[in-house]
């Protein structure tokens, strides 16, 4: 295989959606910082929802984006929590994978803190090939990448099976 066609992990995004600003948001940020070692950033509401008392651009969640070595280390911990299993429908047609973790205390070494409470999180894994993706991101002469070059669902599943010993449950 051409080394530029090799599938790699572009990034891992860990998100906790709190649904409200305030004290719970800072506690969720603290949980993400304990798990990943990186500072969490706020996610903002896209539109106002009167019934939930949410205004547009109000911080309602926190997220951390991990790349390279940090992403691989976090995925080892996350797949341990999921018993090294991921469902087939967790992958989209471009090979990206998404799964949820119901409680942060499931991670190794994490204990329940009554001051923080219980928080679950969503994990998104974005795959790409080693070469060719700059074409889509560059400022001048940017083009869309054809589907033949994009990472397919089966390739992403093979990558996780080889590198993390994850079984894909169909």
Curated annotation (Swiss-Prot):
Keyword tRNA-binding on entry: yes
Top-level taxonomic group: Archaea
InterPro entries given in the database record: Ribosomal_uL5, Ribosomal_uL5_arc, Ribosomal_uL5_C, Ribosomal_uL5_dom_sf, Ribosomal_uL5_N
GO cellular component term of the entry, any: ribonucleoprotein complex
BP-aspect Gene Ontology terms: translation
GO molecular function term, any single one: rRNA binding
Keyword annotations of the record: Ribonucleoprotein, Ribosomal protein, RNA-binding, rRNA-binding, tRNA-binding
Subunit structure and binding partners: Part of the 50S ribosomal subunit; contacts the 5S rRNA and probably tRNA. Forms a bridge to the 30S subunit in the 70S ribosome.
Record's function text: This is one of the proteins that bind and probably mediate the attachment of the 5S RNA into the large ribosomal subunit, where it forms part of the central protuberance. In the 70S ribosome it contacts protein S13 of the 30S subunit (bridge B1b), connecting the 2 subunits; this bridge is implicated in subunit movement. May contact the P site tRNA; the 5S rRNA and some of its associated proteins might help stabilize positioning of ribosome-bound tRNAs.
Family: Belongs to the universal ribosomal protein uL5 family.
Protein name stated in the entry: Large ribosomal subunit protein uL5
Annotated source species: Thermoplasma acidophilum (strain ATCC 25905 / DSM 1728 / JCM 9062 / NBRC 15155 / AMRC-C165)
Gene designation: rpl5
